[in-house]
């Protein structure tokens, strides 16, 4: 939705764009599965942008309009992976950008938890939690079913290692919202 000015040169409606995105992802998933892939991580920058405080300006809408955009994003994602082989593990990494050790967006997951965590049909989420710009763990309470959560607690933006006890305590803090046996640890960029 935020690139519509340029996209409208090639498409008459946003629905047509969404349909082509779905087709493209389905073809890609079919091809990589045929090549032997059984674990697919989709890096999705859209959700990271939606939680940013500048999202209404970026998307050219109001906060209420962002609700419609979240539903559109969810619809495209779920349609894109619909019909994927049952033995293909599909995960979403909510990417906030990591170009030259900086980032493109900030914001807690609270505003997308009800849509993304509760309704996206994936096996796991890779989520950035390496600094305060990602907010707290409470939104993880919305993670539905048996989905796994990979906590990106280890930063790639600094050569300084995290304190082991701090990392352990943050994992236990996240376990208040998602059972410990469904939590995993990774660098913030998945």
What are these regions (language model features)?
Residues 1-190:
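Domain-level signal for soluble alpha/beta catalytic cores
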